[in-house]
Structure formats: C-alpha cells, structure tokens
Amino acid sequence: MNSKFVLIVVFLAVVSICFANEVWDPEKCGCPPFDKVENAVCTKDRATYDNRCQFDCHAKFLSKSGKTLEESPCIESADPK
C-alpha cells in the first residue's frame, strides 16, 4: 500500500514538472527529437515525450509559423504511429 502511494506521488511530480515546463506549448517545443518511446515520458528539457505527442506538437508549431509538415527541417526523423 505504501508503494502505491509513492508511485502516485512520483507520477504527480512528473506530471507537474511537465506542465511547469510547458511541455505542450508549441511555441517552445519546436523540433523535439522524435524517439520511439511507447509511453509518455517527460524530461526537464521538454525533449522527450510520447512519439505521437511530439508529432502533434511539431505539427501545431509549424502551422503557427505558416509551414507544412513537408517543409519541416526535422520531418525526416518523425515516425508517427
């Protein structure tokens, strides 16, 4: 029972780090590395999170700057599921 509590606390800490770092802000995500992580992972530098979310975030970033995914400098590394 204690371990479940610890896991919940750790999960909440990770989620709050994500949102504190504005991981979903397309203005700040730019061209994050596209890796093949199965589950969403958040890091302090906002660089690693779920592949699908990276792709979506990148697409939003590009559409805000008036570009398409084809015009993206980092689309070759994208591998959306």
Curated annotation (Swiss-Prot):
Residues annotated as signal peptide: 1-20
Free-text tissue specificity from the UniProt record: Expressed by the venom apparatus.
PTM: Contains 3 disulfide bonds.
Keywords: Disulfide bond, Secreted, Signal, Toxin
Name under which the protein is recorded: U-megalopygitoxin(3)-Mo4
Phylogenetic classification of the source organism: Eukaryota, Metazoa, Ecdysozoa, Arthropoda, Hexapoda
Gene Ontology molecular function terms on file: toxin activity
SUPFAM superfamilies: Kazal-type serine protease inhibitors
One GO cellular component term noted in the UniProt record for this chain: extracellular region
Organism: Megalopyge opercularis
InterPro entries tied to this protein: Kazal_dom, Kazal_dom_sf
Function text: Probable toxin.
